């Protein structure tokens, strides 16, 4: 998988079937063989290996499958269902194992990723299930403690992961294990839904608060969708009614619960659950807990001092789910903002996701944490949802919604998008297969784009915008190429009475300590930009690095707060570039001489 220098050989590492069934067979385990059909299909074409989205997916996938510090070995993953004290957080029984199984199973389903050891791991997990249906240490039915809430949390994540595996491989033993977890949850529901328990495990318990129970709704909704068993639906509905956003509580737990409510809506079609999520979205986006990066904190105010990759992934996925359910552009725009900024910034150069502290003006390097126990795996799980949202079909038209690399195959067309967006603002949509009749291709014009220039096979075409899209209908042929050129400019946004932030297209800009060391000192927040930018080209020489966004770089003159009579230059660049380099500090909110 790696060349002699240790670099990932992308062309050998992951192969993709163009949304046909995966072309790889997972190694079968006897424990899973009942009613299990092998994964097979036509040989798929190679996935574009230079796309911004796919490269980020591949970075985290490689970290999970082949990385270290720590390595996700079989023993390491199984530690939370035995449980054994091999690592941190094994009391969250099923948390790491469930996320690991779900993320890799979904990667196999969506991207066609070859994960040959997954079957054997799942078989070893399900045989560790307790007679009562749960995994882990002893559950205290009489009077649950924080340890019991942690066990519930982990079992909820494991239920979701096993069901995502079941979506990939219809294994009767796995579904039976999922039913046993569901039956355990139904058994404890009267106690867990009681006012006494809800009040006992308030926000002060944080990661072992009542969200450990409410997040069960995701697995229960999925279990109902698979089985049509009414008790699972009824319990999911009962949980939905007690979900609330408590001050200071755990954001990941709350957003996971909301994603479960969306899953309940998708499984039942009952619009009240969609309305609940829409109201929750309005509540979050109108609060101080919506960050300028498009993300959310780890804890709701007043416990909002750092971010968490799990919460960022949840926020992206919730917005994409709302977008799919409603096609309202505000949800897609919010997801886009978070994908290009908070989620990208949160991804470490190792491929991990985790925590970053934030201040009133920026994101210091101090306090950065790679949260391998949850965020890395939850971040990996987010990529398939993004990939499946790059395109969508509606009313016979194919829509290109997010300016990312992606692929879709529908009866009339098979297309893929390849991106040089970060370098020259362009996307190329290639037609791989086409039918014998005309097909409509609609391409979204995001709010940050001044215009979209479109050409087909090198010839410009003039298109008009309607409802946020430009449309092109013709009889397509294999090999046709549609090039989109997004017109972008730097925008200045007032973010406080005396401070501004800068963006270029979808990217939020910041000053990084790595290439502006003189800008950072004791009075950094008091530095003042002196004039409009001097240059829209990169002025700091650095080795070529992955995930760079040269199109967004800009340079300003500034007065150093500690010696203002000696002005200097500072380069601003996309904070998404953080993934391509060691962790460094960033300033995002600036004083200026003209505002």
Predicted segments with their positions:
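C-terminal beta-strand-rich structural cap/linker in extracellular carbohydrate-active enzymes
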Residues: 441-442, 472-487
């Amino acid at each position: 998988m790696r060349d002699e220098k240790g670099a990932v050989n992308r062309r050998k590492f992951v192969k993709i079937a163009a949304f046909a069934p995966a072309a790889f067979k997972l190694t079968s385990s006897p424990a899973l063989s009942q009613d299990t059909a092998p994964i097979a299909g036509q040989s798929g074409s190679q996935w574009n290996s230079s796309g911004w989205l796919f490269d980020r997916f591949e970075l985290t996938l490689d970290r999970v499958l082949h990385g270290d510090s720590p390595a996700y070995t079989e023993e390491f993953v199984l530690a939370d269902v035995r449980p054994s004290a091999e690592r941190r957080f094994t009391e969250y029984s099923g948390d790491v194992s469930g996320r690991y199984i779900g993320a890799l199973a979904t990667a196999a389903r969506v991207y066609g990723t070859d994960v040959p050891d997954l079957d054997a791991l799942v078989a070893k997990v399900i045989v560790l299930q307790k007679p009562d249906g749960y995994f882990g240490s002893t559950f205290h039915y009489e009077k649950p403690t924080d340890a019991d809430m942690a066990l519930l949390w982990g079992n909820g994540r494991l239920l979701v992961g096993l069901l995502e595996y079941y979506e990939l491989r219809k294994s009767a033993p796995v579904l039976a294990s999922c039913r046993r977890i569901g039956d355990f949850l139904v058994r404890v529901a009267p106690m867990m839904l009681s006012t006494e328990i809800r009040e006992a495990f308030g926000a002060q318990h944080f990661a072992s608060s009542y969200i450990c129970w409410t997040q069960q709704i995701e697995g229960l909704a999925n279990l109902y969708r698979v089985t049509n068993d009414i008790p699972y639906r009824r319990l999911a509905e009962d949980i939905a009614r007690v979900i609330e956003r408590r001050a200071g509580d755990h954001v990941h737990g709350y957003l996971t619960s909301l994603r479960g409510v969306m899953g309940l809506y998708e499984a039942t079609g009952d619009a009240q659950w969609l309305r609940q999520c829409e109201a929750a979205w309005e509540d979050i986006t109108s609060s101080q807990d919506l960050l300028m990066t498009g993300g959310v904190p780890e804890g709701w105010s007043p416990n909002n001092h750092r971010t968490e990759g799990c919460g960022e992934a949840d926020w992206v996925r919730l917005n994409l789910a709302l977008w799919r359910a409603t096609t309202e552009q505000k949800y897609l725009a919010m997801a886009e903002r978070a994908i290009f900024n908070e989620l990208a910034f949160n991804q470490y150069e190792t491929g991990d996701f985790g925590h970053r502290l934030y201040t009133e003006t920026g994101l210091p390097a101090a306090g950065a944490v790679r949260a391998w126990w949850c965020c890395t795996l939850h971040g990996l799980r987010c990529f398939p949802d993004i990939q499946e949202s790059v395109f969508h079909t509606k009313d016979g038209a194919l829509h290109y919604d997010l300016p990312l690399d992606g692929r879709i195959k529908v009866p009339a067309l098979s297309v893929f998008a390849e991106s040089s967006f970060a370098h020259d603002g362009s996307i190329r949509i290639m037609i791989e297969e086409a039918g014998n009749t005309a097909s409509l291709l609609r391409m979204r014009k995001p709010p940050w784009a001044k215009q979209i220039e479109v050409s087909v096979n090198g010839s410009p075409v003039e298109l008009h915008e309607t409802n946020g899209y430009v449309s092109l209908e013709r009889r397509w042929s294999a090999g046709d190429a549609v090039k989109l050129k997004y017109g972008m400019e730097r925008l200045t946004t007032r973010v406080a009475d005396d401070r501004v932030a800068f963006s270029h297209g979808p990217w939020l800009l910041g000053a990084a300590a790595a290439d502006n060391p003189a800008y950072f000192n004791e009075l950094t927040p008091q530095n003042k930009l002196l004039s409009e930018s001097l240059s829209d080209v990169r002025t700091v020489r650095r080795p070529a690095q992955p995930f760079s966004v040269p199109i967004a770089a800009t340079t300003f003159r500034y007065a150093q707060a500690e010696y203002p009579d000696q002005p200097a230059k500072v380069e601003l660049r996309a904070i998404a570039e953080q993934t391509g380099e060691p962790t460094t500090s960033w300033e995002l909110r600036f004083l200026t001489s003209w505002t």
